[in-house]
Amino acid sequence: NCCLTGVLTCRWINSQHFPLSNLYESLLFLAWALTLIHLILEKLIPTNENIIGILFSPLPLLVSAFATFSLPEQMQTMSPLIPALKSNWLMMHVSIMMLSYAALLAGSLLSIVFLIVAKFKKEPISFESNTVNSLTYMLDQLSYRTLGVGFPLLTLGILSGAVWANEAWGSYWSWDPKETWALI
């Protein structure tokens, strides 16, 4: 996470704007957010289970590798912002959206692992017992809490995007494909 923080900080200093103006910077920020969520979840685990590290360690690496090796060079270069992006709403809207994507991705991954572990352990999925320290219970609680953070962040991100659109183009909603899919 320190290396990603350093890269994002250097791009911020060199470009004179928050590094979320293109796909490359957004993917690096997503990798940073995934690492942050990984570190937070590691602190929340009451046991010495290493499953969170096993699950989350490859994600930022894969996102960073995709951003670095798959995107064309012109998408990785810094460029001046267009006038519509020269707003403080850029930093708020895009960073909140990327944090929500990271939280929703993490929660979904935890839910998938919960289903896999519950199937292979062949234990009934019942949360009325006193087995609070079981792996399935821990995965369920972490996925629930992570998704519970992701959805409000997504809502806040969509609302801040609407306010930003009103400031930039004079309309909160324009039925743009990106906006329509955000609504869906």
Explain the meaning of each model-derived region.
Residues 1-184:
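Polytopic transmembrane helical bundles with strong interfacial aromatic enrichment
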